[in-house]
Amino acid sequence: QTITADYAAMRKEYCDRLTESMQGMVDKLSADGFNISSQVGWAHPRYEAIVKEAQEFGADLLVQHCRAFAKIKHIHLTHDSWQLVKHCPLPLLLVKDEEWGDSVVLMAAVDPMNSHHKPVQLDGQIIDAVTSVSGQLGGEYHVVHAYAESARPFTPAGKIKEEHTKAFNDFMSGYNVNEDKLHLIDETPVFALKDYSETLDSDMIVMGAISRSRLAEALIGSTAEEVLDFVKTDILVIKPSS
């Protein structure tokens, strides 16, 4: 009973400190005209409690801060962040420590080939999201589709590029996006998103994610994890509509 009482007291003291600290931020933002409130909770696993609270609150967007390791400038997602990517049904904004430029540049990553049983409507949701965000921020956006021709060495030369070009063009024909903002890249998704994001000097990547079986996660989940870990910009993760 003593241990239980001590634990409860320590937990309350810790939560009280967090509440006081957060209230300072709330007061400052409220003074700037924002309608904002704060809440501190104690739960395990934390990501489940976060998702539950966001759904009960009726949130349109969940924001998670991702810290970099100072010495190597590497953004490694915490367990909670990665679980949110996999399980949060809401749009999830992973915020890094890079500052946005004066003119915001966004990059949407799509897969019109619908690989790995990706829902057909997800790419449309990604374009809708990047269009909405860029409009609200007064920025511009580019659309990227990556494929790796070398991944299928026994396919006739040019066949893979032809398939992906047709799928990409057919999909984008339904949207009013200038050709100079459309990029078809012969590279694996990991390196394409990382390198082209740096080339465009983008401030945010908008990409999709789907919940997979444990077997599928073991086989292809590492690709998504590498993208999320190594890309330095903010990432907006979109989930398929129910």
Task: Describe these PLM feature segments.
Residues S37-Q39, M107, E140-H142, K181-H183, ...:
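A structural signal for isolated positions on well-ordered beta-strands in alpha/beta enzyme cores
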Residues L92, T233-S242:
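Short, flexible loop segments at boundaries between secondary-structure elements
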Residues M10, D27-L62, F69, S173-L215, ...:
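Structural beta-alpha unit
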Residues Q1-K12, V105-T155, K161, D170-V177, ...:
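Small/aliphatic-rich secondary-structure junction motif
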